Amino acid sequence: MHSKTSYLIVRLALGLSMFGHGLVRLPKLEAFSQGLVKSFENSMMPEVLTLPFSYILPFGELIFGALLVIGLFTRVAVLGIAAILLALIFGSTLVENWGAITAQLVHVAFVAYLSHHIKDNSYALDRFVYKN
């Protein structure tokens, strides 16, 4: 398979995953937030950090996922998703949710691929924004 096509497939897969995570959480944002805060109530993470994160997370997933799907500001989207995933991995360790870390690490592998092979991002709106 051509490297540019491979890049597109990975970019779309990660973008749709992140977009979908955010999309399904937004209609039930309050319940999602309450559930996340509750899951951290016995952890070292203070609620003053957990509560705002629980409201910001779905928007970050949705926005960075959408940018990745359309290939606009791909480098920024990849870095934003990396930051989200690192925060999620840290949070998962604090509540000893070892099962979640596996899926998060798979997502990180896709992020690393996209970051490392950014030169193959040809089928994207970035081509029209950055004409160099």
Q: Each predicted region: which residue ranges?
A:
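Extended, low-polarity transmembrane helix blocks
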Residues: 1-32, 47-59, 63, 70-132
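Peri-membrane helix termini and adjoining interfacial loops of integral membrane proteins
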Residues: 30-41
